């Protein structure tokens, strides 16, 4: 259990400290002036004790150890000699660039007409059918639906005469 740096009566688990500090900082922003430790942001110290804390902070050892340790030395086993290549693919200009649209139009791939207007979509689908089934593909005409008998009968509202006032 740890205590809140703003109010010693607040006691909580260490994992809840950061969340609690954010709340207390808003509440006590005008009354208590605390400085944040450069090694651990959960350490909030009054200004007179700040210098002493930075000298004796337990999280300072991580930084000091990093600063005083010798840099890593690569052994000869891990160094690789530079390999020179005889060919450079960037210099070869005889090969055309890859174009995915051209590839898809030639390969046996089903493409989707995304982002097209309805008329363009119908033309695209028709073109794709011709591409997949060959040039001898004939467009199948969809038969129109015949009107049902119920559609041919007049509704009761069609035979009514316009409303006239009684006299």
Curated annotation (Swiss-Prot):
InterPro entries: TRM13/UPF0224_CHHC_Znf_dom (IPR022776), UPF0224_FAM112_RNA_Proc (IPR051591), Znf_C2H2_sf (IPR036236)
GO biological process: negative regulation of DNA-templated transcription; oogenesis; regulatory ncRNA-mediated gene silencing; transposable element silencing by piRNA-mediated heterochromatin formation
Biased composition (Basic and acidic residues): 128-161
Outcome recorded upon mutating residue 57 to A: Decreased transposon silencing but no effect on nuclear localization or interaction with piwi
Subcellular location: Nucleus
GO CC terms, sorted: nucleus
Assembly description: Interacts with piwi.
Name of this protein: Gametocyte-specific factor 1 homolog
Organism: Drosophila melanogaster (Fruit fly)
Gene behind the chain: arx
